[in-house]
Amino acid sequence: MALKKVLTIAGSDTSAGAGMQADLKTFQELDVYGMVALTSIVTMDKETWSHDVTPIDMNVFEKQLETAISIGPDAIKTGMLGTQDIIKRAGDVFVESGADYFVVDPVMVCKGEDEVLNPGNTEAMIQYLLPKATVVTPNLFEAGQLSGLGKLTSIEDMKKAAQVIYDKGTPHVIIKGGKALDQDKSYDLYYDGQQFYQLTTDMFQQSYNHGAGCTFAAATTAYLANGKSPKEAIIAAKAFVASAIKNGWKMNDFVGPVDHGAYNRIEQINVEVTEV
């Protein structure tokens, strides 16, 4: 049986823990065929690990999209898009491609960096991506930006933000709480327009979690492509990334990536799902 084809529109992380490298590793683990349209290349200073983002020429980006669309993706995921032009184009490509699912990971900062890559990108995401997305996967910071509510510090804050984001056109909103809400448990909040669900796992080590957000969104995309409902895909992706985080490892003195193969190779983590 032919594999489902999944396109990631994302940046390249030279350390390979996040970005399109994380997406492709996740796609391989979850039995979908991964394709890439590269938006940028992220490199790191060897002394400080500060990030430098080099955009891909727009003509080259367009040629990548032409190739991918000609193949016919079943699902599309976005990661680091970088510019408002690319954000708009990503939304257009979903429509042009005829793909069944569109997962938006609204990347706004590089791991370890504090400043938004391009403040104007938030409004572009709201205008061009949220109305077309099947699922959007913001972390707390990104959800605060997309909703306009600012800093989110509780499940109730997350519910308010999820409702605002849902009202902007995305039918399935999953806000990743991570370690910000509790030191013992990891809480995410899922909203489908009818019911809020809290997704809970134990809190695992947080020193080596580079690429967790990309991996979660990529897993959601893969599960959707392979036939799971959005709710099922999100819960399964939470389990997949929890295993990856628990088995994260030290790469150097600055960073450690998640283990993208841990779910299949080592262990599968249980996710508790409760209505809230």
Curated annotation (Swiss-Prot):
Pfam family, one: Phos_pyr_kin
Catalytic activity: pyridoxal + ATP = pyridoxal 5'-phosphate + ADP + H(+)
Entry-linked InterPro entries: HMP/HMP-P_kinase_dom (IPR004399), PM/HMP-P_kinase-1 (IPR013749), Ribokinase-like (IPR029056)
Superkingdom in the source lineage: Bacteria
Positions annotated to bind Mg(2+): 142
GO terms for biological process, alphabetical: thiamine biosynthetic process
Keywords assigned by UniProt, alphabetized: ATP-binding, Kinase, Magnesium, Metal-binding, Nucleotide-binding, Transferase
GO molecular function, one term: ATP binding
E.C. numbers: 2.7.1.35
GO cellular component: cytosol
Protein residues bound to ATP: 139, 176-180, 188, 213, 238
CDD domains with a match to the protein in the record: HMPP_kinase
Family per record: Belongs to the ThiD family.
Its biological purpose: Phosphorylates B6 vitamers; functions in a salvage pathway. Uses pyridoxal, pyridoxine, and pyridoxamine as substrates.
Name assigned to this protein: Putative pyridoxine kinase
Organism lineage: Bacteria, Bacillati, Bacillota, Bacilli, Bacillales
